[in-house]
A protein has these predicted regions:
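Short, small/polar residue-rich loop motifs at catalytic or cofactor-binding pockets
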Residues: 231, 306-309, 368-370
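Active-site-proximal alpha-helical segments within enzyme catalytic domains
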Residues: 107-115, 179-190, 256-263, 315-324, ...
Length: 395
């Protein structure tokens, strides 16, 4: 079978090539690419990432979406309620919060497990082989991680004892330092044998929760167990000769893409002002908790009538197409010592938590601007995606 891959992470290409003798399909390549990136692209993503997926099913000629983004803990009853805010020169200047109290429950393994169950043709033990081997033997950081860690390594990743040991070599020499993740390799090997749900209800979740509880975080066993995907919360609309399919509310990324496309079709003399106004409108009106799903979908309906992130796209000659965007926020700096997993800081992303640090999120999906999309034209199907946070709205 012929498979195409487009990715912002170069180790994921090597991961795909490692499967070539097994005749992989697009789902297989997607899974091994994503797992590999969560190992290697430290800081940009992590093994506790949230994800949005758009895909086209060739057998039924149907479009679908899966929302596996972060869910807030039901309550904030951990011991640490302090906002550990740091600043860094990344992107000029940015502030974010570190610490395990910024962790929210990610859906990446639910997403990948769903795709593997429906489309996968190769056992997880084979799909995980390359990232496991890479974690065991060690690797140099990919360029996106280097670019980010030049700004974030000291303030965000060297304060935590476990992370400090892991990154000691790259702290000495960012360009040629080697990262070895033996514990993470063991964790992924275990996951490949017992299944990805172990992150939510098995030994892996117990170890992650042990770190969260001992260091003052708020996620609980029930938060992990009760995590659910949101499937087919999507929109389908036309823009000139393009048919666009993406995630609708509660994610706001798809809406923002449509808003910008709408602005680009208005008076060209006021183009810059129009685009700036879209960004301001988002900040003022779309970033809130409550019934965001209905509000965003209503906004999308109006348009169709009148976004630290990795992107992976795969397609195959069975006409299956996948577009996934996944993120770990800026990273909490916390590494779970018994699993080797770095933890996200989704609750600590200041620009995506308008309710304030540990404010009322109503046990909802957190706000995302990520926007993986499927595009259909008379020439066929294409996949596309964008980073999230403020980047999609201010780039």
């Amino acid at each position: 079978m012929k498979v195409s891959l487009a990715s912002t992470a170069h180790y994921s290409v090597e991961a795909a090539e490692s499967l070539k003798d097994l005749n992989p399909n697009a789902a297989d390549v997607l899974i091994t690419s994503v797992i590999t990136s969560m190992v290697t692209d430290i800081g940009v993503v992590s093994p506790t990432s949230g994800a949005l997926l758009s895909y086209f099913d060739g057998s039924s000629s149907s479009f679908h979406t899966i929302d596996g983004y972060f869910n807030s803990p039901k309550n904030f009853k951990g011991n640490d309620h302090e906002e550990h805010r740091i600043s860094m020169t990344y992107g000029g200047y940015v502030e974010t919060c570190k610490g395990v109290n910024t962790f929210a429950i990610p859906g990446i393994y639910k997403v990948l497990n769903t795709i593997h169950d429906r489309y996968g043709s190769i056992p997880l033990s084979k799909l995980f082989e390359y990232p496991i081997e890479l974690a065991k033997r060690g690797f140099n950081l990919p360029q996106p991680s280097k670019d980010y860690l030049r700004h974030s390594l000291e303030p965000l990743f060297m304060w935590h004892a476990t992370s400090k040991r892991t990154l000691s070599d790259v702290y000495e020499n960012l360009d040629s330092g080697v990262v070895v993740l033996t514990k993470l390799a063991d964790t992924l090997e275990h996951m490949s044998l017992v299944g990805m749900d172990d992150f939510y209800i098995g030994d892996i979740s117990k170890e992650v929760l042990s770190t969260i509880m001992s260091e003052g975080g708020h996620a609980t066993k029930n938060d992990f167990k009760d995590y659910n995907l949101l499937e087919d919360y999507n929109f389908i609309t036309k823009s000139k000769d393009l048919k666009l399919i993406g995630n609708a509310g509660p994610s706001i990324g798809g809406l923002m893409v449509l808003k910008y496309l709408d602005a680009l079709q208005t008076n060209k003399s006021n183009l810059k002002e129009n685009l700036i106004n879209v960004y301001k409108e988002r900040k003022a009106h779309y970033e809130f908790f409550g019934n965001r799903e209905q509000f965003i979908n209503n906004q999308i309906s109006k348009i169709t009538q009148s976004p630290s992130t990795i992107q992976v796209n795969t397609s195959d000659d069975s006409n299956n197409h996948f577009s996934i965007t996944f993120s770990s926020g800026y990273g909490s700096g916390v590494q779970c010592k018994n699993t080797g997993m770095y933890l996200n800081n989704s609750l600590g992303e200041i620009e995506l938590n308008p309710q304030g640090f540990l404010g009322d999120t109503k046990n909802e999906r957190l706000i995302s601007n990520m926007s993986p999309m499927i595009i259909e034209t008379d020439k066929g199907i294409s996949t596309i995606g964008s980073p999230g946070a403020d980047r999609i709205s201010s780039a």
